[in-house]
């Protein structure tokens, strides 16, 4: 996927929210929002796929530790439409990561037990309009 926005040296604590607002491209194949320590250590890889990597209208979540991907977790809900404007809110605690989008909340285990988010990256067919930390 094409590298997009990358933010480093963050200090997002448990219970705080990372909000990413933007627009899904009208011909989107997929995009991802990654949070964690750095590009090789991710608490969450959140990857809505319209039509890529053999998946159609599927949200794939995963973690990455020292450059090695964990087991993919495919979600049944797919609340995204090509061309839509969307706000994605990511929060976490010691046990899990929550991703809130309009109409759906996704949950994924905090497999690495990470205690803060230091890194955010948005890749693929998504145009970032705003980022907010709260």
UniProtKB/Swiss-Prot annotation:
This protein's record includes keyword Amino-acid biosynthesis: no
Protein name per the record: 16 kDa beta-galactoside-binding lectin
PTM annotation (N-acetylmethionine): residues: 1
Role summary: This protein binds beta-galactoside. Its physiological function is not yet known. It may be involved in the regulation of differentiation.
Binding-site positions, a beta-D-galactoside: 69-75
Cross-referenced Pfam families: Gal-bind_lectin
SUPFAM superfamilies tied to this protein: Concanavalin A-like lectins/glucanases
Oligomer status and interactors: Homodimer.
Tissues of expression: Mainly in the liver (adult), mainly in the muscle (embryo).
Domain spans labelled Galectin: 4-134
Species name: Gallus gallus
GO MF: lactose binding; laminin binding
Keyword tags: Acetylation, Lectin
PROSITE patterns: GALECTIN (PS51304)
GO cellular component terms given for this protein: extracellular space
